[in-house]
Amino acid sequence: MVLQANTNKQSTFNLILYSKNLTKTMTPIQTNKMTNWRWVMCAMLFFATTVNYMDRQVLSLTWKDFISKDFHWTDDDYGTITAVFSIFYAFISLFAGKFIDWMGTKKGYIWAIVIWSLGACLHAACGWATFHLADTGWFGENVVKGTLMFTSISVYLFLACRIVLAMGEAGNFPAAIKVTAEYFPKKDRAYATSMFNAGSSVGALAAPLTIPILAAAMGWEVSFIIIGAIGFIWAAAWAFMYEHPHESNNVNEAELAYINSDEKQEEESTTSEDEGLQLTFGQCFTYRQTWAFIVGKALTDGVWWFFLFWAPAYFSELGYPSNTFTGQMLIFVLYLIVTVLSIYGGYLPKLFVENKGMNPYAGRMRAMLIFAFLPIFAMFAQPLAGVSVWLPCIIIGLAGAGHQAWSANLYSTIGDMFPKSAIATITGIGTMFGGLGSFLINKGSGKLFTYAEGQGDTFTFFGVTGKPAGYMIIFCYCAVAYLIAWTLMKMLVPKYKPIVE
């Protein structure tokens, strides 16, 4: 019995020892298999950007066919609203990046999306507030519906809501670019940026299929509330899911080593880490790299915002308003083209880096030159509208895809040349100048279209008369903006030159 007991104890001991050895043998396999939490973060950025653009699109899809009927808006009124949004977006962007760097990615992003979601929902109260202010004698006497004063009240209320929306939305891209720099090595950043930036196209793609239907079924006010409320859900998920990769339990050592592969490659040529170099706000403006990014944003952002804000109104002018099936399909197909093609925006420079041996910045600049040629087709949109409305739809889609591919690489140039501690700040500075460019195009477009419509056939441009001539002028600018921007960027920063001191 004693011998049998000792034998059993020995067997048990051997089994425990074998289990421990087996565990030790398995652990390296489990550890070395790289996790992919960085792509979960990229998916979160994609959804945030989708919500961002859907909130921005609600007004452009409801003003012409729903809101203007209540308040008698003109193109100039709408142009003023979009221009003020652009200018406040630009102004807040100047500080949003610094705010994200100071607050931190997690808290800063939550603040941004909560503010813009609140601003989106507040639009729903503008109708009630306009009628209430008009009826209660706030302006000395009851304001008659349909008068200039009544219209002005509604415009100012929408302006206030757009300002709140702009305050929050200005933080989206600085935060997203900072997350991309935290979670991806340089060679993957353009691709990751193109993936989350596709959210802007998907948001614009989903908007015409949902917003006009909601507005027609339940009122334009409800469309603002439902779309705006989605942002609060995202904020709750972000608070639960995001941690810096060094602190995240969902990132193992293998993935962390891959994320930090840039630092390992560069430690022989520099003794300071990216995260450690601190740039003051004023110092950022002393670098040519900053001004290259500024030029790239200022000359091209307005093109995308023009397509975003004015495409539904343009198709409505051609006889296909957003509350018709064809009008909705035109916007859907336009942004479907943008979404599908823009994804390759980050893949092309990756091919240049891996197959041609180019550094990331050189690969991006070559890809951006290729993408800069796509918007040239925009100058043919208006002349071909008389043949078929689907031709300008496809052409604007190609131009929009060129912009999104360009934009993904433009944002990634920041991570190529600036320390991580300054990425959100530089993004905010560039976004501010992009917003200024958007202000000029949107306000100028509204003024131009109203003037051209009033002049009728006496207003001509390249053989096109009246209001269509106004669109022709803007389309021509859209066609050449990217080639001009690329040329100036190349003059400012001819070769890859990271900022290390």
Predicted feature residues:
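Conserved MFS/SLC helix-loop-helix module at the cytosolic interface between two early adjacent transmembrane helices
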Residues: F91-F131
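C-terminal ends and interior cores of transmembrane alpha-helices
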Residues: V114-T151, L369-G386
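Residue-level signature of mid-helix packing/kink "hotspots" within the transmembrane helices
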Residues: Q57, S86-L94, A204-L205, Y335-I343, ...
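Multi-pass alpha-helical transporter architecture, strongest
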Residues: A237-Y242, A378-P383, Y471, C476-E501
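Cytoplasmic helix-loop-helix junction between adjacent transmembrane helices
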Residues: C161-S200
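Helix-loop-helix hairpin linking two adjacent transmembrane segments in secondary transporters
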Residues: S201-H246
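C-terminal transmembrane helical hairpin of 12-TM major facilitator-type secondary transporters
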Residues: A362-N409
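Extracytoplasmic gate region of multi-pass secondary transporters
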Residues: L59-L61, Y287-S342, S407, Y411, ...
